[in-house]
Amino acid sequence: MSQAPMVREHCERCLNSARWNGNPVLMIVDAAFDSIGLNYFQSVVPKVELFNQQFVATGQVRVLEDLVKADDTELRQIWKNSRSWKVAREIAAHLVWVKQQKKIGDRDALIYWAKNAPLNGWEKDPVGSIKGVGINTYQYLRMMGGVDTVMPDKIVKRVIYEILDTAGIKHPANDIEFVLAVEALAPGTGFRAIEICWMTWLIQSEAGLSRTEKYAALLPKI
């Protein structure tokens, strides 16, 4: 944690569903853009900020319903990948259904979904079953909805596998077992699973600097 001093603060925002100023529309767009595997800080974050400026700040997309109905041609002026927008709109559509069923707001709908979204059988969940939503996007959304968990992506796995190898512990057999293993190991490390997840990303180097150093001014905003 000493290598990533902003991790705990960032994870608190995540667990409080307060990333992107607590705006679920931006959190969903973030996850949808991130789902295609581009560099998060260099590609995804600037485009989410641009979407915020041109659609959210102008009042064009204020709530989840607006995102569901947003014009694809206009959206693709921000981000050209149509699949990302389809993923974003379908996630938003399910959360709109949650809103209506539970008579709650956008943020509470994300939180309610995340708290009730299963890890085992995630592919059968209404969000998990959306084409383009893999286990990493699913887990990322759960994290932004307040769940203390981890994404089984390649960077997190590489770091955790190095730790397991040093301890002589066998690698988990699949993504679900990996997530469960990290959740089980986390208390013994003094960190939460979500902190371990973000720490593995933020200690990575770009241009000779850790991401916490390189993006120090950006992290508090997201």
Regions flagged by a language model, labelled:
Residues 32-33, 115-167:
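Catalytic DNA-binding helix-loop module of base-excision-repair DNA glycosylases/AP lyases
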Residues 54-130:
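Alpha-helical ds-nucleic-acid-binding substructure associated with the helix-hairpin-helix region
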Residues 35-46, 96-104, 204-211:
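Short helix-capping/linker segments at secondary-structure and domain boundaries
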Residues 61, 165-173:
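Short, positively charged loop/turn segments that connect secondary-structure elements
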Residues 26-39, 89-94, 143, 194-207:
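Short, hydrophobic/amphipathic alpha-helical patches that form generic packing surfaces
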Residues 43-46, 151, 155, 173:
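Alpha-helix N-cap and coil->helix boundary residues
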Residues 1-84:
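Structure-specific DNA junction-binding interface
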Residues 32-33, 172-222:
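A basic, often C-terminal nucleic-acid-binding module that engages the phosphate backbone, implemented
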